Amino acid sequence: MSSRENPSGICKSIPKLISSFVDTFVDYSVSGIFLPQDPSSQNEILQTRFEKPERLVAIGDLHGDLEKSREAFKIAGLIDSSDRWTGGSTMVVQVGDVLDRGGEELKILYFLEKLKREAERAGGKILTMNGNHEIMNIEGDFRYVTKKGLEEFQIWADWYCLGNKMKTLCSGLDKPKDPYEGIPMSFPRMRADCFEGIRARIAALRPDGPIAKRFLTKNQTVAVVGDSVFVHGGLLAEHIEYGLERINEEVRGWINGFKGGRYAPAYCRGGNSVVWLRKFSEEMAHKCDCAALEHALSTIPGVKRMIMGHTIQDAGINGVCNDKAIRIDVGMSKGCADGLPEVLEIRRDSGVRIVTSNPLYKENLYSHVAPDSKTGLGLLVPVPKQVEVKA
């Protein structure tokens, strides 16, 4: 029977269509991106291990700076001037810390989600990870939030609540959940002009919050890609013994609000946790615990290097412990060190190299700042011509 012969079938679908339209309207108002809801992804198993791709690109901490985030993707040839995916079958791992220190955190989350979908259609893949700042924000720890960051979430909350009001006008839809349920109207020892931004941020990012559930539940906390293991801070043997898949699923369950309450699992909290560890990312190589690193790597079959963010490397992307630890946080966000974007590239046929936007390399690869004489960087890039420079 056709829809013309059975108009009731069309009528029954109208509430869902209206709900979808409202969600898309809210998304565009917040981010400038049309991003249809993708409910099926919420039920997918969070994959931990991946085969080595032909081309793998690793990107460090982004911290609320959309302009620098775009630049990092552009120098790697992953997007065009209209932010469309051009990376083909490339696999990308972004090691976390999208949140805090900048005012475009939500825009980056939408930007990454859009690119994930475009990459999948082209045969590529983008993995996003949880950093310590994602964990902190889900817990309600906003020490590193900026004024613009509060404003961005307040704008989101205004649109989100407007969307909910629009849905209540449509019979046939369940009453939307109040995102502010249980959140106090004010906070002691806090400026009154911050109240609404803080409330909006709690509403969005707490366990089972709309933004946490939609975006952050898709994040890995640990990922093994070919012969590399990715983590925001670092992995110790005890974390690996606990189980990498187990860590990913438990953190995801906590973000979804299934268990654990306000605070993250213990292995995500404290100085020796997977998102806070700095044993392998200290800028001074002699301070890195290479023995602990080698022990950890030896417990993951087939893995020969650990790639991490978390600690800003003033010298740029570099390796220590015979390149078994590669540190890729270059502090690119203007809220951090305003560093020049760099990304790590691993090709199956030609190994590891650094792609940088640093104009000094472009001017004279054999100058005093050539990579073979740059502290730390030379450990990864033995000869200058292995550095690719993009404007």
Curated annotation (Swiss-Prot):
SUPFAM superfamilies: Metallo-dependent phosphatases (SSF56300). Expressed in roots and siliques (at protein level). The keyword S-adenosyl-L-methionine does not apply. Mn(2+) 1 binds at D61, H63, D97. Its cofactor is Mn(2+). Induction: By infection with the bacterial pathogen P.syringae. One of its GO terms (cellular component) is cytosol. Mn(2+) 2 binds at D97, N132, H232, H295. Shows phosphatase activity, hydrolyzing the artificial substrate para-nitrophenylphosphate (pNPP) in vitro. Belongs to the metallophosphoesterase superfamily. SLP family. This is Shewanella-like protein phosphatase 2. The gene is SLP2.
